Curated annotation (Swiss-Prot):
Main location group: nucleus
Pfam family for this entry, one: RRS1
GO biological process terms, semicolon-separated: ribosome biogenesis
Cited PANTHER family: RIBOSOME BIOGENESIS REGULATORY PROTEIN, RIBOSOME BIOGENESIS REGULATORY PROTEIN HOMOLOG
Keyword Nucleus recorded: yes
Bias (Basic and acidic residues) ranges: 151-169, 226-237, 298-311
UniProt keyword list: Nucleus, Ribosome biogenesis
Entry protein name: Ribosome biogenesis regulatory protein homolog
């Protein structure tokens, strides 16, 4: 019991985080080398791990196929955050207006009574209330202009409302980005916002890069942009992909010649590029001149009279 009390006083164990440390540890003397320091750290770390294991075995466990499982208690040590605390977002225009007028947000029901069909329908989504397809008649108003299609005007007004909402959303994101409260998973391409707050602001996209991106987007359809409707003033993409023509798998008439021609074209391109490496012109000229000299010397030897081997050479008078 005394040893357990001593270890509890020496070590502080947080089983919830599987953390143990000794706040009173002191080196008896300064380590003279790195190896001695590592040895001391491993010795002390082994004691701390053993203390955590002793605490775990004191908790009740349940047996499973993978082995005993222990329910850990809640942690007692507060670990520091890796990221800073999220900054509050600036209020949007609607939130400022609602706060000024005292408008409180209330939860709306998902199902609403539709007077056109006399039944309950969803507020949003498929088969919703006040759907444009379910409106057979639109009552005329005194302010309506003659000759204007009310159904087309209804769709046009809806597009304008959606565009205005999108514009307000982008402005809210810009304001949040200026305040440093934009979420890291949101990226606004219109303002070139970075993906993470820790990254530097990206450079402005140049004209060539925009052209490359537009060309990739134009050729990303199933037909490679061939049958797509062109916008007014749209230029053809600069970098158009080339389709590689493969030879047929099943051998037929003329396939051998086509394959031979294709191989010869590849070899001719390789040889033309590296012809200066394959043929040494100076060395070839020297070899040609040497062979020519040898041929000349061989012809002159044939014209000379042959010596009589049987005759002995005459001794010169001393």
């Amino acid at each position: 019991m005394d040893t357990e009390m001593e270890t509890e006083q020496i070590y502080q164990v947080d089983v919830g985080n599987l953390l143990a440390f000794n706040p009173n540890h002191r080196f008896p003397s300064a380590p003279s080398s790195r190896g001695e320091l590592v040895k001391e750290i491993l010795t002390e770390g082994t004691k701390l791990v053993q203390e955590i294991a002793n605490k775990l075995f004191n908790f009740p466990s349940t047996e499973t196929n993978d082995g005993p499982i222990v329910q850990l208690p809640p942690p007692t040590t507060k670990l520091p955050r890796e990221k800073h605390i999220p900054r509050p977002k600036p209020p949007t225009k609607w939130e400022e207006f609602a706060l000024k007028k005292g408008i409180q947000k209330r939860k709306k029901e998902k199902v609403v009574w539709d007077e056109q069909t006399n039944q309950f329908k969803r507020r949003h989504g498929y088969d919703r209330v006040n759907d444009d397809n379910d409106v057979p008649i639109i009552e005329a108003k005194e302010s309506d202009e003659p000759g204007v299609d009310p159904f087309a005007k209804r769709l046009d007004d809806k597009k304008k409302r959606v565009g205005k909402q999108e514009k307000n959303r982008l402005q809210n994101l810009k304001a949040a980005e200026k305040a440093g409260a934009l979420p890291s998973h949101v990226q606004l391409a219109a303002t070139s916002l970075p993906i993470s707050g820790t990254k530097a602001q990206p450079k402005k996209i140049g004209k060539d890069e925009l052209g490359d991106v537009a060309g990739l987007a134009a050729t990303s359809t199933a037909s490679g942009g061939k049958f797509d409707k062109k916008l007014p003033g749209e230029k053809p993409p600069k970098k158009q992909g080339k389709h590689h023509k493969y030879l047929p798998v099943v051998s037929g008439r003329g396939d051998v010649n086509a394959e031979k021609e294709q191989t010869n074209n590849v070899l001719s391109k390789i040889f033309s590029k590296h012809s200066h490496e394959i043929l040494n012109v100076g060395k070839a000229i020297n070899m040609y001149n040497v062979k020519k000299e040898k041929k000349k010397s061989g012809r002159s030897d044939k014209l000379k009279p042959k010596k009589d081997i049987t005759k002995k050479p005459a001794n010169k008078a001393k």
